């Protein structure tokens, strides 16, 4: 396959003319969410939700579980990266005027509120 044929093949993809690097953040959201689900699952396996043993189970994950400290750090950093990608994704929508499409914008707003409520509940009530 020649270089010119490869460039022609990529130019025929159905992509708008105003595509930019801002559009990558939607797929990065999926990657961050996948990492959050996987690390959260493995952390939940070793976590004890008892109020008297919660701190001990965190120490157990950090010290005794193989690569537990990596899972904890990946989960914490992944959550921050997830929210950064969300805010950049929303900023792209505002910049390109996607808020004019009311149905899509309202469904995205509903997803954002649900996401923030879930993240808040998981941070506040994980010890009860």
Curated annotation (Swiss-Prot):
GO terms for cellular component: mitochondrial inner membrane. Heme b b562 binds at residue 75. It is found in: Mitochondrion inner membrane. SUPFAM superfamilies: Transmembrane di-heme cytochromes. Its cofactor is heme b. It is a multi-pass membrane protein. Heme b b566 binds at residue 89. Keywords: Electron transport, Heme, Iron, Membrane, Metal-binding, Mitochondrion, Mitochondrion inner membrane, Respiratory chain, Transmembrane, Transmembrane helix, Transport, Ubiquinone. PANTHER family: CYTOCHROME B (PTHR19271:SF16). Heme 1 (or BL or b562) is low-potential and absorbs at about 562 nm, and heme 2 (or BH or b566) is high-potential and absorbs at about 566 nm. Component of the ubiquinol-cytochrome c reductase complex (complex III or cytochrome b-c1 complex) that is part of the mitochondrial respiratory chain. The b-c1 complex mediates electron transfer from ubiquinol to cytochrome c. Contributes to the generation of a proton gradient across the mitochondrial membrane that is then used for ATP synthesis. This is Cytochrome b. The lineage of its organism: Eukaryota, Metazoa, Chordata, Craniata, Vertebrata.
């Amino acid at each position: 396959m020649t270089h010119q044929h490869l460039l022609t093949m990529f130019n025929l993809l159905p992509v708008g003319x105003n595509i930019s690097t801002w559009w990558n953040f939607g797929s990065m959201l999926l990657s961050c969410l996948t990492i959050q689900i996987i690390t959260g699952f493995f952390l939940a396996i070793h976590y004890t939700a008892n109020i008297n043993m919660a701190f001990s189970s965190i120490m157990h994950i950090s010290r005794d579980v193989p690569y537990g400290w990596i899972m904890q750090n990946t989960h914490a950093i992944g959550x921050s990266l997830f929210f950064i990608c969300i805010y950049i994704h929303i900023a792209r929508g505002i910049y390109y005027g996607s808020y004019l499409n009311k149905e899509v914008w309202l469904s995205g707003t509903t997803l954002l509120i649900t996401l923030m409520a879930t993240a808040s509940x998981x941070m506040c009530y994980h010890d009860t």
